[in-house]
Each structure stands twice: as C-alpha cells, then as structure tokens.
Regions:
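N-terminal secretory leader/proregion of peptide precursors and effectors
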Residues: 29-33
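Bacterial signal peptide processing site
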Residues: 22-25
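C-terminal motif of bacterial Sec signal peptides marking the signal peptidase cleavage site
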Residues: 18-20
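Primary mode marks residue(s) on the alpha4-beta5-alpha5 output face of response regulator receiver
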Residues: 37-195
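Sec-dependent signal peptide recognition
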Residues: 9-14
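N-terminal secretory signal peptides that target proteins for export/translocation
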Residues: 1-8
Length: 195
C-alpha cells in the first residue's frame, strides 16, 4: 500500500459508510440482505471444496498461508500487526443458514480493487472460553465504487444493501463449509458464545 493512498482510502470508506445511511434503490434492504442479496451468489458460491478448480484450490491454499498469522486475534487487530482494527459490521453475524462470526476490517484495504492475499476483513467464531477462532476471510468493495459486481476466482460478489452498501465475497479458508467454499453463511460456524 502506498502511504499517500491512506487518506484517500479512509475518505472512500467514510463516504461508503455515509452512503450506508441512504437508501440504495437497486440494492436489497437490510431486512432482505440475508436472504435475497446472499442468494445472488448463485451456483458459483455453492461450489464445495471437492468441486473447486485447480486455480481455486491453489488460491485457497495461498489465502491460508497469507492469513495464518491472524489466528492470533491480538496480532490481527493490532494497528502495527494485521491492522484489522474495527468490527464491520458490529456484532456476530448469524442467520438461519449458519453464521459468519465477527468481522474485523482493515480500513486501509477498502477500495475498488480486490487483492486475494489482502482481504479487507477477517472472520472469527467466538469460542466457549472467550477465544476467537479464525474461520475465513471476506472481500468487500463499496457499491459506490463499482456499478457491477466484482469477481474473484470466477465467483461474483453479492450486493449487501443498507446499512453496509458493499459487494461481498467470503472464502471459508479455515472452516469447512458444507454450503460451499464461497457461500455467504456457514452452518459449521456459530454465534452461540458471542458476548
């Protein structure tokens, strides 16, 4: 990341968060976000681990290698460590289809570009003893920066409407997902121990 881009990226995130308070006519609302928007992933997001292409398998292995150090949430959330310093959105995300856990955002990575080895968010499942277990990564692009869905590894991002207003794609690099490697929700992840 170029140091002179930091203020611009922060400004973009601030604008995206402000826009999150405004209705977006062609984007699902927060109440339909869990069902409609995530359904937009289509068949591509339901690819199970055994059905991944050779390129996708290698990419997941590369993501695991790049994010291995984030198993230590203290390092991941330190400003001088991983830089994933804020929750976005706040709280443990769950739905009838499974959960995603807590999302930690690296604000400096949010822009119109998607970099496989530099995900904008890392996701953690809360454990019974207060520990946080790394389960996957999430890539986002503010809707305001891309009129069409970005793609990664041949999989289109899904639009998430207010209050988030982003395109999103999950990779369950650290927790097997029977719904698929790129599915939005993972039934093997739980918010049961969220505090």
């Amino acid at each position: 990341m170029h140091e002179h881009n930091v203020p611009m990226r922060r400004a973009i995130v601030t604008i995206a968060l402000i826009l999150a308070c405004s209705p977006a006519p062609d984007v699902p609302t927060a109440t339909t976000q869990a069902s409609s928007a995530h359904a937009a992933h289509g068949a591509a997001s339901r690819i199970n681990n055994g059905e991944l292409t050779a390129e996708q398998k290698q990419a997941v292995a590369d993501v695991r290698k790049a994010t291995q150090r984030f198993h230590d949430i203290a390092f991941a959330t330190a400003a001088n460590g991983g830089g994933y310093t804020m929750q976005f959105p706040a709280g443990c995300a769950a739905s009838p289809d499974g959960a995603q856990g807590f999302h930690y955002l690296n604000n400096g990575l949010v822009d119109a570009n998607v970099e496989l080895l530099r995900p904008e968010l890392v996701m953690y499942e809360p454990g019974p003893n207060g520990q946080m277990n790394l389960v996957g990564v999430d890539y986002i692009v503010p809707l305001a920066l891309s009129a069409t869905p970005p793609t990664l590894l041949g999989v289109p991002f899904a639009p998430l409407g207010p209050p988030l207003n982003v395109w999103a794609l999950h990779i369950w690099a650290w927790r097997p997902n029977p719904s698929g490697m790129f599915a939005p929700w993972n039934p093997k992840v739980s918010c049961e121990f969220a505090q």
